[in-house]
Amino acid sequence: MPKYLIADFIVEIEPKFDYLKKLCEPFLYEGERSADFSAIPSDSYLNSLLSRMVEGSTIDEAEEFATASIFNRKIIHRGAMLVHSSALVFDGKAYLFSADSGVGKSTHTKMWLKRFGSKAHILNDDKPVVKIKNEVPLCCGELRLTAEAELLTTKPFP
């Protein structure tokens, strides 16, 4: 079963549809660590979810949403959670800008990129994972990177 390194977790995922396959591809893990957990939705869960999604939604979208939901529930029990924010790395440290939708988190992040150039890069522009490891808060990217993301990394940043 394929394993992926996502937000510093080794996760078993079996993408069935192209959208999730493409999202997962850069995170493929071939190392020796065993999986921390699996995030594999059942067919019945996918079909149930799709029937409740906005008209016109695809099974590909349902699979990504279902897999992300499983992932999100499982990381909570491992000292991590998603934070609705825009996260960037500046001089090796993560900075998160969190607010209601439409306030300007991404705009603020882009201003940092413009101001600091190559010293800064986007880690995740929507829902980075924050976890505590050895009493240190760390920020990690996850599958849903934006087109503006300059760095695809599995490395956590303090």
Report the location of each language-model feature.
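A noncatalytic interaction/capping subdomain that flanks phosphate/NTP-handling catalytic cores
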Residues: 1-101, 111-123, 129-158
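Conserved lysine of the Walker
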Residues: 105
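Hydrophobic positions on the alpha1 helix immediately C-terminal to the Walker A/P-loop
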Residues: 108
